[in-house]
């Protein structure tokens, strides 16, 4: 039941549980009299146990809509959109410019913060649900916007920021 509750509002609790800095723990009013609720550790423990016990399995849609959706970008936002759309019965193709799926989760988060095996487990689940992944596809270069519009019923743009940008704040 705990795993189901986590997944009801969060596609990827194994990512957020490891990566969130947990500011809520510092603000927890319970901390006035005793240690605050360690929600970050609770979340990680629940989802890790759920994977170990085999409680997290592919959720294959019972009915297909016949509609196709392109998702451009395979970072956390693109993956969450893809999983929800696939589970709703749409044919989903995720396009990724890089050679591997995951965006920031794959290339921006160091292994000591989140082992890539957690990402790979989730990607395998998504593939088993019916999500298709296409890597090495730079939309706008290898595939035009017109092709996406012509070939898909909807397009989700979930591209990440590949270059940093300084804020123009003096001092």
Locate each region found by the language model.
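FAD-binding core/adjacent interface of flavoenzyme oxidoreductases
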Residues: 16, 22-72, 88, 131-171
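Beta1-alpha1 glycine-rich phosphate/pyrophosphate-binding loop at the start
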Residues: 1-10, 32, 36-40, 71-139, ...
